[in-house]
Design a protein with these regions (language model features):
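A glycine- and small-aliphatic-rich helix-loop capping segment at beta-alpha/alpha-beta transitions
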Residues: 34-45, 71-76, 96-106, 132-137, ...
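Structural signature of FAD isoalloxazine-binding scaffolds in flavoprotein oxidoreductases
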Residues: 32-47, 58-60, 103-122, 154-157, ...
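Glycine-rich N-terminal segment of FAD-binding domains in flavoprotein oxidoreductases
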Residues: 2-80, 328
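C-terminal substrate-binding/cap subdomain adjacent to the FAD-binding core in PCMH-type
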Residues: 95, 114-266
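Conserved glycine-rich FAD pyrophosphate-binding loop
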Residues: 9, 22-24, 39-41, 68, ...
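Short beta-strand
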Residues: 28, 199-202, 295-299
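A generic, well-ordered mixed alpha/beta core segment in the N-terminal half of proteins
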Residues: 54-119, 127
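Short Gly/Ser/Thr- and Asp/Glu-enriched loop/turn motifs at secondary-structure junctions
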Residues: 31-33, 51, 214-216, 297-304, ...
Length: 375
């Protein structure tokens, strides 16, 4: 694969034209396929921080760390940012649909995107939506373009809704061996309307992957807010932990925790691999423990990030079946690659691809293909 680093729109559009003439796939990520690769490292500017509308517009190569540092100076915060994402750029985050640790607290990342500049397969540049929050009538093209893993269009710049920078933050940790306790914890937190900024659990297999010699899985909770609000939430969480006999305590090494989460991201094979109702996740966790499959997830959400020792379509299909038996679902992106996605959804996808990328060249997916160890 030949990789180019265009400096401007004219050069970028010329590359797409070249790919079309030579009938080469256009690859925007680090695939090992033959084709024309585009490295967007020169799309690295923060175009605007709007303190009136509370938005920031930045190009795709800007990292979360750079973005957060810039908006912090204005007393603002990028809600989807957590320390494990500091070196991740915006383009990779959305192209790979990375798991957002704060989505339950602040909303899903795609709902925090107010505007987009996207490049279509034919070289057309579109400006989609804008700075203000509004209800959408008809198709929401902003969410459509940000959610397709760069299969239909390439986001070049995003406008993100910001929130006020919280003054106080506390990290708590505990070790939990009984999966049923996690379900009870999620239920009690919901009953008291407590949503930590981050609530994350990784199982014993994931701990072993991180070379942690712990007897059980690890629970991490990050709470933020004003001092008064934080004290109230911590008292309620402490009472719940005592009730469930969870040895919850202040985390003394938060930097190490963020590093470990970063490592879990690096090892993850099936991001949002399966989704199971949070109150039935114990069944899925027991199955994963039996097969020694590492996983991490938010106990309040039920979207599991999976790290199998060997990824293949047979195993993924089995896990999807187990998730469905618990009222959950698999991930269409992986099901398509492993060749067992629903026919109706596959047909819709193929029609969208034909409409937006008739040459089938933008980061092409192959049904039953080899990506992620597919058969």
């Amino acid at each position: 694969m030949t990789t180019y680093k265009p400096y401007g729109m004219t050069e970028l559009q010329s590359l797409l034209q070249q790919a079309a003439e030579q009938k080469l796939p256009v690859l925007t990520r680090h695939q090992h396929s033959a084709g024309l690769g585009i490295d967007f490292q020169n799309w690295n500017k923060i175009r605007e921080i709007d303190t009136v509308n509370l938005t920031v517009t930045a190009e795709r190569a800007v990292t979360f760390g750079e973005l957060e540092e810039a908006v912090n100076e204005k007393g603002l915060h990028v809600a989807m940012m957590t320390e494990d994402l500091r070196a991740v750029n915006l383009g990779d985050f959305f192209a790979e649909q990375m798991y957002c640790l704060t989505s339950l607290h602040y909303n899903q990342p795609r709902l925090q995107i107010l505007g987009l500049e996207v490049l279509l397969a034919d070289g057309t540049v579109l400006q989609v939506a804008g700075k203000t929050v509004k209800n959408v009538t008809g198709y929401d093209m902003c969410r459509f373009y940000i959610s397709n893993r760069e299969q239909l269009a390439i986001p070049l710049a995003v406008t993100i809704k910001l929130v006020s920078l919280e003054a106080v933050q506390t990290m708590l940790e505990a070790y939990i061996a009984d999966e049923a306790v996690l379900v009870k914890l999620a239920a009690r937190l919901r009953q008291q309307n407590i949503t930590p900024q981050v609530c994350l659990y990784w199982n014993k297999a994931a701990a072993e992957l991180l070379q942690q010699a712990e007897p059980a899985g690890r629970l991490i909770m990050v709470c933020n807010g004003s001092k008064q609000r934080l004290e109230k939430d911590l008292q309620a969480i402490s009472a719940i932990a005592d009730e469930l006999q969870i040895g919850l305590q202040l985390c003394e090494q938060p930097e190490q925790v963020w590093y470990e989460i970063k490592m879990l991201r690096t090892h993850t094979v099936w991001g949002d691999g399966v989704k199971v109702p949070s109150l039935r996740c114990d069944g899925m966790l027991r199955l994963l423990a039996k097969q020694q499959i590492a996983c991490w997830y938010n106990p309040l959400q039920g979207s599991l990030q999976l790290i199998p020792a060997q990824a293949d379509g047979v195993l993924y299909r089995q896990l999807c079946s187990e998730a469905e038996a618990l009222g959950g679902v698999g991930n269409w992106y992986y099901m398509y690659q492993y060749g067992f996605a629903a026919a109706g959804e596959t047909k819709i996808w193929q029609r969208l691809k034909q409409k937006f990328d008739a040459g089938q060249r933008l980061n092409p997916l192959t049904e039953g293909g080899a990506e992620h160890g597919a058969e």
